[in-house]
């Protein structure tokens, strides 16, 4: 009576949050590049010569993102004017970030809801 032991290996993704954090970090440190020719070879070099050359692990981009603050139908951007924001948030839904430094108006709204309260 012989027994066999099998080992099975497979690749697995790290937790989604960890992947997101790494991508966000890379996005925040992305370098704007332009195409240049060295001899007959085309290479990507930083648009700003004060930045260090990128590595194969870095994110790079050729074109800047549109300004999402202002209305620009050509690029499909609706802008942020008139949107509702969270006055206390420092995240993307916060008024400081969403209103792009234009300032914002604060409205106090009272919401009345029916509930099944028992006293």
Swiss-Prot record:
Disulfide bonds join 69-100, 85-95. GO terms for biological process: canonical Wnt signaling pathway; cell fate commitment; neuron differentiation. It comes from the Eukaryota. GO terms for molecular function: cytokine activity; frizzled binding. Glycans are attached at residue 86. The keyword rRNA-binding does not apply. Signal peptide: none annotated. SMART domains: WNT1. One of its GO terms (cellular component) is extracellular space. Palmitoleoylation is required for efficient binding to frizzled receptors. Depalmitoleoylation leads to Wnt signaling pathway inhibition. Keywords: Developmental protein, Disulfide bond, Extracellular matrix, Glycoprotein, Lipoprotein, Secreted, Wnt signaling pathway. InterPro entries: Wnt, Wnt_C. It holds the Pfam family wnt. It is found in: Secreted, Extracellular space, Extracellular matrix. Ligand for members of the frizzled family of seven transmembrane receptors. Plays an important role in embryonic development. Belongs to the Wnt family. This is Protein Wnt-4.
């Amino acid at each position: 009576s012989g027994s066999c032991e099998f080992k099975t290996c497979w690749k697995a993704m790290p937790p989604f949050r960890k992947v997101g954090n790494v991508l966000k970090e890379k996005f925040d440190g992305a370098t704007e590049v332009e195409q240049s020719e060295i001899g007959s070879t085309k290479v990507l070099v930083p648009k700003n010569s004060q930045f260090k050359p990128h590595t194969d692990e870095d994110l790079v981009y050729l074109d800047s993102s549109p300004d999402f603050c202002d209305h620009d139908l050509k690029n499909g951007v609706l802008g942020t004017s008139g949107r509702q924001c969270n006055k206390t948030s420092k995240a993307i839904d916060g008024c400081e970030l969403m209103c792009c430094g234009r300032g914002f108006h604060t409205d106090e709204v009272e919401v009345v809801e029916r509930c099944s309260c028992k006293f």
